[in-house]
Amino acid sequence: MKNYIEIVDVYARQILDSRCNPTVEVEVELEDGTVGVAAVPSGASTGAFEAVELRDGDKSQYLGKGVLKAVDNVNTTIADELVGMNVLDQVAIDKTMIELDGTDNKAKLGANAMLGVSLACAKAAANSLGMSLYQYIGGVNGKVLPVPMMNIINGGKHADNNVDLQEFMIMPAGAPSFSEALRMCSEVYHALKSTLKAQGYDTGVGDEGGFAPNLKSNEEAIVVIIEAIKKAGYTPGKDIFIALDPASSEIFEDGKYNLAGEGRVLTPEEMANYYVELAEKYPIISIEDGMAEEDWDGWKILTEKIGNKVQLVGDDLFVTNTERLSKGIKLGVANSILIKLNQIGTLTETLNAIEMAERAGYTAVVSHRSGETEDTTIADLVVAVNAGQIKTGAPARSERVAKYNQLLRIEEELNDMGEYRGLKAFYNINK
């Protein structure tokens, strides 16, 4: 195997994401003519501690959301340093960009610029070596197909309705394989559409492909999903489980949680009890961002109440950042981390966060963003690191389906070597 393959060109362009906003795409070319291409996603509900996504701010172009500054940073500052480097040395590539940026939050070059380059380098390296991306990142041990955490009802910032909680998801942890899990979710998705239609609800979809009906309450969203699971011929709590992403930072005001759609304002203790009641009533296996990103006391209360039986995922809380994750581990809050590549800005730092989580007994859920592209890197990443869970939207909208289709290809390639862990993927809770 080659041990040095020189980077000869690094080039970025501005493209569009699934929300019709500009984003960065990067091409990295190697001395043997091989090319790696990566496109960067973007979030709607972003954590305050995420790495900076560099936008132009010119209101006359794309309402100020252009990324030409980030593109220029790739084509000049970053390219000047990386051309001539060994594409196989991912750590050195990412370290070089981090040092070039020189800030704690990627504010100078932009996490969108740096991530595009980081991922394009990994893809170019894999292509040059004739390997799949998951094999290149994970080596011989990358073989676990993930349980999908599939968003099928949208609320909060992802939809224009009166549902406060942002995402209501299904997890087919009872499926025997990834392909069967995908089939089950697809059937529930269709059953949900017909259920909503029969009840007179709109079946338009939100940013991530989930339906966005104007339901009467958050609990009604769970009820119609349970109904759809049964209608599709599956058993809630055995075949398919429920997962929630309240995105609580978005409803946290003056130390309390404002459930405006239900006309209630709750203290952190009351909010924790709200989740306890839901988890006792319904087969809820995972809750993401149940408390706000700076409500560490609220997180502690929630973790003490149900952290032994419900996966509690930190997204805005941890932002794929080892410093914040380390604090959470020391305080004993949450038991899982959501992994979003663009929250931290390089592949190396992402892998470090996953490793830290797993060493502490926390699960890692690899995730998309609401503003996505056709890029399928996260599908390869989740298999490479054996994370066992992926969150990448409904089985609708091609930028979501692209990830699922890539996982089907990987499952086929792995054949008997592949493993779908189902409930065993939740090693952080008592099942």
From Swiss-Prot:
Binds a second Mg(2+) ion via substrate during catalysis. The keyword Lyase applies. It is found in: Cytoplasm; Secreted; Cell surface. Keywords: Cytoplasm, Glycolysis, Lyase, Magnesium, Metal-binding, Secreted. Transmembrane segments: none annotated. Gene3D superfamilies: Enolase-like C-terminal domain, Enolase-like, N-terminal domain. GO terms for biological process: glycolytic process. Pfam families: Enolase_C, Enolase_N. The active site is at residues 208, 340. Pathway: Carbohydrate degradation; glycolysis; pyruvate from D-glyceraldehyde 3-phosphate: step 4/5. GO terms for cellular component: cell surface; extracellular region; phosphopyruvate hydratase complex. Its EC number is 4.2.1.11. GO terms for molecular function: magnesium ion binding; phosphopyruvate hydratase activity. It catalyses: (2R)-2-phosphoglycerate = phosphoenolpyruvate + H2O. It is an enzyme of class 4 (lyase). The keyword Iron does not apply. Mg(2+) binds at residues 245, 288, 315. Its cofactor is Mg(2+). (2R)-2-phosphoglycerate binds at residues 166, 340, 369-370, 391. Catalyzes the reversible conversion of 2-phosphoglycerate (2-PG) into phosphoenolpyruvate (PEP). It is essential for the degradation of carbohydrates via glycolysis. Belongs to the enolase family. This is Enolase. It comes from Clostridium botulinum (strain Kyoto / Type A2). The lineage of its organism: Bacteria, Bacillati, Bacillota, Clostridia, Eubacteriales.
